[in-house]
C-alpha cells in the first residue's frame, strides 16, 4: 500500500497563520452571540402583537413595540455586517501572511519537481482559503451553534412543537451530510481535471506559433477538449446532486414551517397555546434552520477550500522554510567545483559525474560538447538552482546554499539557453523586475551587452513594454536584452548558456 505523504508540517504552518487571528475570531463569536439573541426579536414581537396588542387594542403599545423592534433589527444588521467584514479581513490577512511563503515554495518546488501538481495551483489554493473566510459559510457555522438554543426555546412553548423542530432539523442535517459525502468525489475530480485542462490550454497558447504553423490546432483542441469534457461531466454530476439536495432541503424547510403552523393551530384549538406562540414558534424554527440551508448552498466553497488547504499543506511540507542564514560578505568570485555530480530533476541518473575545476577572478571557462552532454546542467549547478547530488560548488569558500538566495542572485549573472522576458518595460526586465530600476545601471548593462543602440531605436526606448512572449521583438533582440539582464548590477560570476544563439554574426 502506498504511503500517504506527511502534510503535518505544512498544516502546522497554516494553523499558525490562523492562530494569529484567534482574538478576532473570538470577537466574531461574540458578535454572533448578540446577532442570534437579536434573532429572537421577531418571535417576541409576534408574541406581544398577538397576546398583548390585539387583546388590549392599544395603538400606543403597538407603536412603541414597533419602534423598539426596528431599533433591535438595525442593531442586528450592524453587528452582522461587522462580523462579515472582520471575517473577510481575517482571510485577507492570512493570505497576506502566506503569499510570499507559498509563492517561494511553489517556485522552488516547480524547479526541482516540474510535474508536481501542487505548484500549478498554489496561489489559487490560497485564494480559495481566503474566499472561504469572505463567504457567508463561516457566519452560518457560527449561527448553527445556536440552532439547539432556538430548538430549546421552541420546547418552552410546547414539547410537541420542540420535537417537530428537532426531527426536522435532524433530517436537514442528515441531508446536508449526505450531500457532502456524495458530491465530494465528483467535485474533486472536476477540480483536478479542470486544472489539468487549464495547464494544457496555457501550454498551447504559449506555443501558438508552432501550433498554427504545423497545423496542430485540431489535435491540440482534441487533447484539451478530452480533459475539459470529463471535468465538465463530473462538475455537472456534482452540481446535479447539490441542486437536488438544495431544492429538497429548501422545500422541506418550507414544509416544516407550514407543519409548525398546522401543529400550532391544532394546539391553539386544544387551548394549550396562544395564537402568538403558534406564529412565534414558526418564525423561530425558520431562524434555527436557516443556517443549515445557507451552509448547504455554500458547501462547494468549503470543499474547494478544504482541497486547497490539503494541497497547500503538502506543498509547504515538501518545501519547508529555509533556515536563517548569516549574511556573508560580498564575494570576490573564486569559484571552486569539487567532485561535482549532477542529476536532473525527478531523475536518479547522473548527467555529470565528478567534475572539478577552480576559477579565479578574471578567468573564463568555455565548455564545449554535443547536445545532451550536460552543459546546461553544469550551468544550473553553478548558479545554485540545481543542488549537487554529490560534491560541492563553492563561491569564495562557501557553498552556494550558505548564501541567502536573493543575495546570491545579485552576485550572479545568468543567461539561460532559452531567454524569457516578463510583462513590463525593457528597463524593468534588464533590472530584474525591480519596481524602481536604477537608470544608470540599466544603461550600463545594456551598453556592455551591445543592446543600447538597439533599444533606443524601439518606439519608447527603454520604456517600451514587452510581453512574456517577447511581442514585436526578434529572437536576437530578446537575446541581447537577456544578456543585459545577466550583466545588470556588475555580478561577480557570469554564467552564459549559448550566449550567441539567435544572434546574427
Regions found by a protein language model. Give the residues of each.
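Helix-to-loop junction immediately C-terminal to a conserved catalytic motif
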Residues: 383
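ABC ATPase nucleotide-binding domain helical subdomain, centered on the C-loop/LSGGQ "ABC signature"
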Residues: 394, 427-468
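Membrane-integrated ABC transporters
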Residues: 1-39, 55, 59-64, 83, ...
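Cytosolic ends of transmembrane helices, especially the final helix of ABC transmembrane type-1 domains
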Residues: 88, 216, 240, 288-315
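An intracellular "coupling" helix at the cytosolic face of ABC transporter transmembrane type-1 domains
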Residues: 15, 19-23, 111-112, 125-133, ...
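Transmembrane helix-loop-helix hairpins at lipid-water interfaces of multipass membrane proteins
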Residues: 25-82, 86, 155-160, 271-275
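Hydrophobic alpha-helical segments in the permease module
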Residues: 68-80, 168-171, 242, 246-253, ...
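Transmembrane helices of ABC transporter permease
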Residues: 32, 65-72, 139-189, 262-273, ...
Amino acid at each position: 500500500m502506498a504511503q500517504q505523504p506527511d502534510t503535518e508540517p505544512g498544516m502546522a504552518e497554516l494553523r499558525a497563520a490562523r492562530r494569529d487571528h484567534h482574538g478576532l475570531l473570538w470577537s466574531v463569536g461574540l458578535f454572533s452571540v448578540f446577532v442570534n439573541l437579536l434573532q429572537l426579536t421577531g418571535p417576541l414581537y409576534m408574541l406581544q402583537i398577538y397576546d398583548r396588542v390585539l387583546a388590549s387594542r392599544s395603538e400606543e403599545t403597538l407603536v412603541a413595540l414597533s419602534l423598539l423592534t426596528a431599533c433591535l433589527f438595525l442593531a442586528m444588521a450592524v453587528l452582522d455586517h461587522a462580523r462579515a467584514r472582520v471575517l473577510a479581513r481575517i482571510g485577507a490577512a492570512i493570505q497576506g501572511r502566506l503569499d510570499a511563503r507559498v509563492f517561494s515554495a511553489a517556485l522552488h518546488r516547480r524547479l526541482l519537481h516540474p510535474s508536481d501538481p501542487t505548484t500549478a495551483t498554489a496561489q489559487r489554493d490560497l485564494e480559495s482559503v481566503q474566499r472561504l473566510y469572505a463567504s457567508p459559510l463561516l457566519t452560518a457555522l457560527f449561527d448553527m451553534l445556536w440552532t439547539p438554543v432556538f430548538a430549546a426555546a421552541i420546547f418552552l412553548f410546547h414539547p410537541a412543537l420542540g420535537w417537530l423542530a428537532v426531527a426536522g432539523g435532524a433530517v436537514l442535517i442528515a441531508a446536508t451530510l449526505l450531500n457532502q459525502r456524495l458530491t465530494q468525489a465528483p467535485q474533486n475530480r472536476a477540480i483536478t481535471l479542470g486544472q489539468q485542462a487549464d495547464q494544457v490550454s496555457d501550454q498551447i497558447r504559449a506555443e501558438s506559433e508552432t501550433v498554427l504553423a504545423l497545423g496542430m490546432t485540431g489535435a491540440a483542441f482534441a487533447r484539451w477538449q478530452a480533459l475539459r469534457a470529463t471535468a465538465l461531466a463530473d462538475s455537472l454530476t456534482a452540481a446535479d446532486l447539490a441542486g437536488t439536495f438544495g431544492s429538497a432541503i429548501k422545500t422541506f424547510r418550507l414544509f416544516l414551517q407550514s407543519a409548525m403552523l398546522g401543529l400550532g393551530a391544532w394546539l391553539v384549538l386544544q387551548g394549550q397555546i396562544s395564537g402568538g406562540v403558534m406564529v412565534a414558534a414558526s418564525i423561530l424554527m425558520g431562524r434555527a434552520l436557516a443556517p443549515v440551508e445557507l451552509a448547504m448552498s455554500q458547501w462547494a466553497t468549503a470543499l474547494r477550500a478544504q482541497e486547497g488547504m490539503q494541497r497547500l499543506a503538502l506543498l509547504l511540507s515538501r518545501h519547508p522554510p529555509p533556515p536563517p542564514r548569516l549574511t556573508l560578505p560580498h564575494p570576490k568570485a573564486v569559484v571552486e567545483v569539487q567532485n561535482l555530480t549532477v542529476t536532473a530533476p525527478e531523475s536518479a541518473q547522473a548527467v555529470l559525474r565528478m567534475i572539478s575545476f577552480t576559477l579565479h577572478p578574471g578567468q573564463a571557462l568555455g565548455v564545449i560538447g554535443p547536445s545532451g552532454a550536460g552543459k546546461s546542467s553544469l550551468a544550473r549547478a553553478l548558479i545554485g538552482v540545481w543542488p549537487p547530488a554529490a560534491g560541492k560548488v563553492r563561491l569564495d569558500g562557501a557553498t552556494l546554499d550558505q548564501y541567502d538566495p536573493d543575495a546570491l542572485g545579485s552576485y550572479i549573472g545568468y543567461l539561460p539557453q532559452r531567454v524569457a522576458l516578463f510583462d513590463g518595460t525593457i528597463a524593468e526586465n534588464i533590472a530584474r523586475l525591480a519596481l524602481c530600476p536604477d537608470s544608470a545601471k540599466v544603461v550600463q548593462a545594456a551598453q556592455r551587452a551591445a543592446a543600447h543602440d538597439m533599444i533606443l531605436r524601439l518606439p519608447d526606448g527603454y520604456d517600451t513594454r514587452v510581453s512574456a512572449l517577447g511581442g514585436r521583438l526578434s529572437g536576437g533582440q530578446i537575446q541581447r536584452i537577456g544578456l543585459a539582464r545577466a550583466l545588470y548590477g556588475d555580478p561577480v560570476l557570469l554564467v552564459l548558456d549559448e550566449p550567441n544563439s539567435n544572434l546574427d554574426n
